[in-house]
Regions:
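Conserved small/polar residues in nucleotide/adenosyl-binding loops
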Residues: 168-173
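Active-site PLP attachment segment
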Residues: 86-148, 160-167
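A short glycine-threonine-serine/GTX helix/turn-capping micro-motif
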Residues: 149-162, 174
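Fold-independent oxyanion-binding glycine-rich loops
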Residues: 18-21, 40-43, 65, 69-72, ...
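Active-site core of PLP-dependent enzymes with the aminotransferase class I/II
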Residues: 43-66, 74-80
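Glycine- and other small-residue-rich loops at beta-strand/loop junctions that grip anionic moieties
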Residues: 16, 45-49, 69-71, 159-162
Length: 178
């Protein structure tokens, strides 16, 4: 909540909050012309709300935007959001992956199914990137465009990655973690 309500506005990013207990249609009513994505949790924190992932995915795709699902609480063992139409799934490493709040980090998993070029809302993935000699992530990387952009640009420029020592002490498999 704090990320969307307090931190992102400092960067000019607006968030529209909806009451998920009112059903999936509230998501459609909140979509504006500049909406970039829909973001839900498989199990809402702190109220344990459950959302129809498939219905929200249909709404998002109808409007040419991806559905991002925070699956931290449910874990991939219990819920696999890609099977219901999610485009990106995120997990907080602080909770179940790291164990007891000793790890500050997260995991981003991209289904590779969302067409980032179709809606015209994601020029940073479609247009030539001068810092990568004109590479277009959608054209040159294809299905892995988003997650490659996160790794190649966001991690490079913002440094949001686990330290080698912390990664080594994590009980999770280490290959491919960001």
């Amino acid at each position: 909540y704090n990320l969307f309500a307090h931190t992102l506005p400092d960067f000019g990013i607006e968030t529209t909050f909806v009451d998920p207990t009112k059903g999936s249609s509230v998501f459609e009513g909140a979509i504006r012309e500049n909406t970039q994505l829909l973001y839900i949790e498989t199990v809402g924190n702190p109220n344990a709300n459950l959302i129809d992932i498939g219905a929200v995915a249909e709404i998002a795709h109808k409007h040419g935007i991806p559905l991002v699902v925070d699956n931290t609480f449910a874990t991939p063992y219990l819920v696999r959001p890609f099977e219901f139409g999610a485009d990106i799934v995120v997990h907080s490493a602080t909770k179940f992956i790291g164990g007891h709040g000793t790890t500050l980090g997260g995991v981003i998993v991209d289904s590779g199914k969302f067409d980032w070029a179709a809606s015209g809302k994601f020029p940073w993935l479609v247009e030539a990137n001068p810092s990568y000699h004109g590479l277009s992530f959608t054209r040159d990387v294809g299905a892995a465009a988003f997650v490659t952009y996160v790794r190649a640009v966001i991690l490079r420029d913002l440094g949001a990655t686990l330290s080698p020592c912390l990664l080594y002490t994590s009980p999770s498999p280490r290959d491919g973690l960001l």
